[in-house]
């Protein structure tokens, strides 16, 4: 009887210690869990817009990865390092400045556009700290994130 209680207590301790790591999250096969979200690294480079569309199609509520803590960043960087070598990876942050509500001074709607600047999107590196921006049209690997 005492042995059964000891084993049951041991299993409870293991379960509770794993519950914060994503082991108890309901993530699809191939996805990894952390803090109520599921993550997956994709190794086929895409533009920022194509990567975001791809993430939305993968799972309900899916988007390019967003970071809300250094711990989450560390988790994703470790996940990436298990899948890819040093890479540039898109994240879900962008500055699409030319999509503001522009209009001509005579009141006409802006239909023709000839912007000289590009939109810039944010990426992170699996080996370097910090975020950087580059043209959204360039290709990069990416990580999708969705609610668990």
UniProtKB/Swiss-Prot annotation:
From the UniProt annotation, give the residues forming the signal peptide.
1-24
UniProt miscellaneous comment: Shows greater sequence similarity to the beta than alpha subunits compared to other heterodimer snaclecs.
What tissues has this protein been observed in?
Answer: Expressed by the venom gland.
* S-S bridge residues: 27-38, 55-144, 121-136
Q: Where is the C-type lectin domain?
A: 34-145
The protein's name is: Snaclec B4
InterPro entries in the cross-refs: C-type_lectin-like, C-type_lectin-like/link_sf, C-type_lectin/snaclec_domain, C-type_lectin_CS, CTDL_fold
Role description = Interferes with one step of hemostasis (modulation of platelet aggregation, or coagulation cascade, for example).
Which top-level group of life is the source organism from? Eukaryota
Query: What would be an example GO MF term here?
Result: toxin activity
Q: Which Pfam families match?
A: Lectin_C
Q: Kindly state which keywords UniProt assigns to this record, in alphabetical order.
A: Disulfide bond, Hemostasis impairing toxin, Secreted, Signal, Toxin
Tell me its family.
Answer: Belongs to the snaclec family.
Q: How does it assemble?
A: Heterodimer; disulfide-linked.
Q: Does the keyword RNA-binding apply?
A: no
Q: Does the keyword Signal apply?
A: yes
Q: Which residues form a coiled coil?
A: none
Give Gene Ontology CC terms: extracellular region
What is the annotated localization of this protein?
Secreted
